[in-house]
């Protein structure tokens, strides 16, 4: 996988408005055909939408699970990340590390490896997302 050199704060992914960090950005570039040397690519197995965001989405969709899923996919398609435009909040994800950029692999003390399971403690509101559903999914409300 060819890697590009990115800004250490991730601003190379910001589309709109320019000059802000990814969490403050309205839209970020989630084009995964471009991978930067300071990024970690994960295959996501589970999205956990935060409570405020999920409640707002659920109410807007009348509790219809299909519509909820479509709305989440729409947010990610429009914004490049899961950041609810009404609440400003995101959530977190669970997944598996698929690729680690060279700048990170070479950092002293960095011990993450491809294939490791991972839980993101960084909000989805600042994490670029590209959702491609390759198998049936379900909506668990807990």
Where are these regions (language model features)?
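Conserved protein kinase catalytic core
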Residues: 52, 105, 141
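Short amphipathic alpha-helical surface micro-motifs
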Residues: 5-11, 21-27, 75-80, 102, ...
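Single conserved hydrophobic/aromatic residue that forms the stacking wall/gate
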Residues: 131-142
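Short, Lys/Arg- and Gly-enriched loop/turn segments at beta-strand edges
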Residues: 53, 125-132
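Glycine-rich beta-strand-centered segment in the early N-terminal region that forms part
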Residues: 33-48, 59-124
């Amino acid at each position: 996988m060819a890697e590009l050199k990115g800004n250490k704060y991730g601003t190379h992914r910001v589309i709109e408005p320019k000059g802000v960090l990814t969490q403050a950005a309205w839209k970020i570039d989630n084009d995964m055909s471009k991978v930067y040397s300071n990024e970690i690519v994960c295959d996501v197995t589970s999205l956990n939408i935060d409570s405020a965001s999920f409640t707002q989405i659920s109410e807007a969709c009348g509790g219809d699970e299909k519509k909820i899923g479509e709305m989440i996919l729409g947010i990610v398609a429009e914004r490049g990340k899961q950041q609810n435009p009404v609440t400003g909040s995101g959530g977190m994800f669970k997944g598996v590390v698929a690729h680690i950029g060279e700048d990170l692999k070479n950092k002293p003390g960095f011990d993450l490896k491809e294939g490791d399971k991972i839980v993101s403690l960084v909000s989805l509101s600042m994490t670029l997302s590209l959702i491609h559903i390759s198998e049936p999914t379900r909506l668990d409300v807990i």
